[in-house]
């Protein structure tokens, strides 16, 4: 009964909470559109503002829980063409990106991908990003649409500094923004079987974190194995002229068109961060539980922007840590305060929270004071002026289903 009430709350409140997350007040006439806008409308999508774009929240009468479960059990496809796709090329491209991020890109194998973070001078996260290395002088990078202006201004500023430096003079780096390119995420346990019917490329060799140019029904497309759901899947980059055709190929039964609502519940079950909720410029990768993106060889000696602040948190411990929790009672949403149960001391706040369709429990992530982050710790979360019990639990909340061969 508790979960049924929570599911009802989810359906009623989720769309508005999603919009509040991004604090969008953009008028519809000002919203950008991906190359699939008309395709979405033709398929009954409910379009909503998100990160400056008009994006599908859901399709037809497919409910949030049903859409979520379809991806967990079968396969769904998401339009993520609002995200910013870029190429960095040049003799010193590896050095430039290792200056902007704490990742060890020099040791990354060609056509391998890694999650990373762009850091400000204090070690705060400007954005999280996926970086795919094609060669030492060529990288494909995906960043968040909601951070487009901030990211591109930062990248161009730092690119100018780099190319004007002694290192940059060894070989300037060029930035190419892939404007209007499509990006589709095919996700779910049946994703590989479905995509395999469209290509002669043996997808068994394309394991999680790898990328390749794959022939798909006559189109040679950049395909990276991974995603934002915790399931097996692929992110497929598509030139503007072919986006609609490829979307049609990737949306036949059993694939279900899937929107932002489902994408958010899937990523939270998988323990993945949403920028603007769980990450911001006042949060370091150590606080965010993303220490693993910092290359082992770079923790002590890496010369990256923000290194001093990051090393301070690595050495002394951060003031707070990102945690997952199971919440009793009503679901806890963003900004819900977290308290110590006995003293009543304020420990932190929830950054994302939903009723989990998979677990049939209310889950949340947030930040608490360092020392209160251990598994099994009991805390209280304030929901509508009432304090409810919550127990800290490891993330991801569900077991990932990535294909590792």
State what each model feature region is.
Residues 2-10, 20-49, 55-59, 135-137, ...:
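Conserved, structured C-terminal
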Residues 2-4, 15-119, 124:
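Acidic, proline/glycine-enriched N-terminal capping motif
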Residues 79, 128, 235:
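Acidic active-site catalytic centers that drive phospho-/nucleotidyl reactions
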Residues 103-158:
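Well-ordered mid-protein domain cores that form the structural environment of catalytic cofactors
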